[in-house]
């Protein structure tokens, strides 16, 4: 059986691994990777709108890796539309890069689960192979963290280099052209970043299992010694 300190350390590492999986699943299933403001350029050009009137032609957009939504204002009131990345929109964007992002994140989930399994194993037993001990946990957490970092780096590249938001906003728009006024990374993206940080913290936690705490020694109570006077008494 591992020592009490190691049981505590690996139990906490298990919690971090669970947290990483939860963060990634929530990030993948939500639609706030990017939020932004759009301008209906076609409507502005048609009426030659001045700056005070531009508010009547501004809308909003939000999307994730699988779906999202937008509101469009082109002088005809607010129009809401749902955005689905699959199966059609994926053909209009850099589909290879998009699939790589999803692949990296699912890979990270897989290695986070492996890390969880080995944390539980180390909390209950003393491993007889180094790959099953802290060394293996370093590897699984490093691969998971690296995969996450590659995933959000590719997503940033899709936004900055391939104008992902502009393609998503103008998909299925035949009469109007939408211009991106502002785009921000939403909370779903930052959940992915937090998941990567979790794996870094997990490596530090696992490393702390090597710390040897001093054993608390309890003094045995001294036994009373019988003297000759005690016997006479």
From Swiss-Prot:
Q: What happens when the gene is disrupted?
A: Depletion of clrn2 using CRISPR-Cas9-mediated gene editing induces reduced response after sound stimulation. Furthermore, clrn2 crispants show disrupted hair bundle structure and fewer hair cells compared to controls.
Record's GO cellular component terms: cell hair; stereocilium membrane
Any one Gene Ontology BP term: sensory perception of sound
Membrane as a keyword?
yes
> Is Acetylation a UniProt keyword of this protein?
no
Subcellular location, record wording: Cell projection, Stereocilium membrane
Q: What is the tissue specificity?
A: High expression in utricle, saccule and lagena of the inner ear. Expression is restricted to hair cells.
Entry keyword set? Cell membrane, Cell projection, Hearing, Membrane, Transmembrane, Transmembrane helix
Protein name per the record: Clarin-2
């Amino acid at each position: 059986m591992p020592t009490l300190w190691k049981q505590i350390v690996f139990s906490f590492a298990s919690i971090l691994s669970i947290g990483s999986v939860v963060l990634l699943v929530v990030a993948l299933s939500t639609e706030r990777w990017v939020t932004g403001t759009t301008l209906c350029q076609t409507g502005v050009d048609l009426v030659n709108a001045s700056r005070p009137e531009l508010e009547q032609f501004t809308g909003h957009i939000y999307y994730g890796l699988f779906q999202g939504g937008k509101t469009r204002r082109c002088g005809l009131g607010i129009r809401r539309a749902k955005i689905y990345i699959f199966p059609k929109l994926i053909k209009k964007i850099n589909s290879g890069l998009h699939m790589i992002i999803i692949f990296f994140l699912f890979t990270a989930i897989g290695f986070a689960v492996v890390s969880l399994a080995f944390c539980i194993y180390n909390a209950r037993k003393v491993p007889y192979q180094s790959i099953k001990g802290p060394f293996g946990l370093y590897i699984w957490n490093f691969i998971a963290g690296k995969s996450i970092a590659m995933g959000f780096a590719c997503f940033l590249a899709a936004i900055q280099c391939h104008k992902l938001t502009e393609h998503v906003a103008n998909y299925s728009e035949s009469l109007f052209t939408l211009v991106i006024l502002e785009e921000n990374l939403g909370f779903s993206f930052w959940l992915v970043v937090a998941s990567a940080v979790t794996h870094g913290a997990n490596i530090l936690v696992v490393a702390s299992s090597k710390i040897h705490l001093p054993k608390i020694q309890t003094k045995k109570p001294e036994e009373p010694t019988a003297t000759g006077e005690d016997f006479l008494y």
